[in-house]
Every structure is written in structure tokens, then in C-alpha cells.
UniProtKB/Swiss-Prot annotation:
Family from the record: Belongs to the shikimate dehydrogenase family.
InterPro entries cross-referenced by the UniProt entry: Aminoacid_DH-like_N_sf (IPR046346), NAD(P)-bd_dom_sf (IPR036291), SDH_C (IPR041121), Shikimate_DH (IPR011342), Shikimate_DH-bd_N (IPR013708), Shikimate_DH_fam (IPR022893), Shikm_DH/Glu-tRNA_Rdtase (IPR006151)
Pfam families: SDH_C (PF18317), Shikimate_DH (PF01488), Shikimate_dh_N (PF08501)
Binding residues for shikimate: S21, R22, S23, T68, N92, D107, Y223
Pathway info: Metabolic intermediate biosynthesis; chorismate biosynthesis; chorismate from D-erythrose 4-phosphate and phosphoenolpyruvate: step 4/7
Record bears the keyword rRNA-binding: no
Protein name: Shikimate dehydrogenase (NADP(+))
Length: 279
């Protein structure tokens, strides 16, 4: 386990099991780039040990942490969450304000920042259509509501799940049955896939992109493979796209700033570094 005494400020990723993550690669790149003495490690903590580990995070030498499966909901209960974490129902970033352990959800910022960079003015192109009603969808929908998108259609194969999620975000979020996509696509300026369809080992997302307006933006949260069938088809039609790797990189920015006191940039060099690790 890393300690602040030997490495300067430190942060970590808490998960179970401790799967391969690109987060250490990202944060160590920024630490080296800015000459900051510090570190970022992966801590494999089972659910039964999570509360104790988090409550003694600073004792372990950490200024904060990222939290991944299966701990995101429990992290919300053990910390003082901000409005984003509360609305999304999950926390993925922990940090201290004085002696108080606080939490936020940087997936929201990661998603929106990635769109701003990849497709400027994306928020002026009409309705949004979000595919899927799982945990990732909550962060996306909250970000779109926060940005002021007037109408957000939320489609899921089990429409009741979409309805339950939509009810939590107000009248601008409208649940939709999967078989109504053909009617929705012609008025959609932003299409977002939050499902696992198109991920390596999963079937591709079957959707008729020809129905989208020519100025529409297509975003996919999947980043393995980097070029999903959905994004490939969208680019072939001349549509602007935003990939899942961009969201991964941008969501890491806020945590680094909270822990190490400097807001880093998502550079092409960093992107190339992580892309190489994905291959």
C-alpha cells in the first residue's frame, strides 16, 4: 500500500476484484508531466472491508480515491456527496475538505467535457436520445439535464426501467419503447449509446443511422473496441462522433485536480498512451 510519507500525495482506485484499469496510467502521466511527487495505486478491497478502508483513507496515506464496481453506491452512503453524486445515485471520486470525506461523480463531467471537445455546439442540435437505462445512463441523463437540453428521450428494451429512471429527472426526460426508435431518430441531434452493445464480445447495436439529421452527433460510452460498429457507421455517414475513451480521460481530470491541486489537460499524447494500452 502506498503512503503519502514516502511518495508525496497519493490517490488510489478501490474495486473488487481489482480488474485491469487505465486510471494509474492516466494519473501517473499527469504526475510526471507536472513534476508532482505522488502516486496512484489500485487497492483490491472486498465489499465487507470497504467501509473500514474508506473511513481510514487518510490513515492509509491517501488524499482521495476513485471508486469502481461494486462500491459506487456504498461510497455515496459513507461520504458527504455533492448534488451530482446524489442525483446519479453513485459516487466514483472521494476527496477531503478539511477532515470531511466528500464524494462526487465525475462521469457527468467526463461525458459533457468529451462532447464539448469532440463535437462543439452539440447542445444546439435538437433532442437527445439516450439508449439504455443502467448506471451509466444516469450520469449521462443528469449531464444533459444540467446542460439544459430541452427534450431527452430515454429508450430501453424494458421500457419500465426507462420510465422509473425518467421519473427521477423531471418532465424533460421522456421514456421510450425500443420499437419507437425509428420515429424518434429524425428529430434527434444527439444519440448516446450507454448499453454494452458493440463492446468486444457483444453483438453490435442495430440502429438505422440514416434516419438521423445530417448535423447529428453520435456518442458511444464503449471504449473497447475504441472504434465501435456504431461510431464506424456514424463516421461513414459524415456524422460527428464522441468515443468512450474521451469520456474516460475527461472524467479523470476532476479527481486529479481535487487530490493534487492542479487541473490537468487531456492531451493527444495522453490519448495515444492509453490507446496503445488498449491494443
Amino acid at each position: 500500500m502506498m503512503t503519502a510519507e514516502t511518495t508525496g500525495r497519493a490517490a488510489c482506485l478501490i474495486g473488487w476484484p481489482a480488474a485491469h484499469s487505465r486510471s494509474p496510467l492516466i494519473h501517473h502521466y499527469w504526475l510526471r508531466l507536472h513534476g508532482i511527487t505522488g502516486g496512484y495505486s489500485i487497492e483490491a478491497i472486498p465489499p465487507e472491508g470497504f467501509a473500514e478502508f474508506v473511513m481510514h483513507l487518510s490513515t492509509h496515506g491517501f488524499a482521495g480515491a476513485n471508486v469502481t464496481i461494486p462500491h459506487k453506491e456504498r461510497a455515496l452512503q459513507l461520504t458527504e456527496p455533492d448534488d451530482r453524486a446524489r442525483a446519479v445515485g453513485a459516487a466514483n471520486t472521494l476527496y477531503y475538505e478539511g477532515a470531511v470525506l466528500r464524494s462526487t461523480n465525475t462521469d457527468v463531467e467526463g461525458f459533457i467535457s468529451n462532447l464539448d471537445v469532440a463535437a462543439p455546439s452539440w447542445d444546439r442540435t435538437g433532442d437527445a436520445l439516450v439508449l439504455g437505462a443502467g448506471g451509466a445512463s444516469r450520469a449521462v441523463v443528469f449531464g444533459l439535464v444540467e446542460r439544459g437540453i430541452g427534450r431527452i428521450h430515454l429508450a430501453n428494451r424494458t421500457v419500465e426501467r426507462a420510465r422509473v429512471l425518467a421519473d427521477q429527472f423531471g418532465a424533460t426526460v421522456i421514456p421510450a419503447a425500443w420499437n419507437t426508435l425509428g420515429d424518434l431518430l429524425p428529430r434527434v441531434g444527439l444519440l448516446v449509446n450507454t448499453t454494452s452493445l458493440g463492446m468486444k464480445g457483444q453483438p453490435p447495436l442495430d440502429i438505422e443511422l440514416a434516419l438521423l439529421p445530417r448535423d447529428a452527433v453520435v456518442a458511444d460510452l464503449v471504449y473497447v473496441p475504441l472504434e465501435t460498429p456504431l461510431l464506424s457507421a456514424a463516421r461513414a455517414r459524415g456524422l460527428r462522433t464522441a468515443d468512450g475513451l474521451g469520456m474516460l480521460l475527461h472524467q479523470a481530470v476532476r479527481g486529479f485536480e481535487l487530490w493534487f491541486g492542479l487541473r490537468p489537460a487531456v492531451t493527444q499524447e495522453l490519448r495515444a498512451l492509453v490507446e496503445a494500452d488498449l491494443l
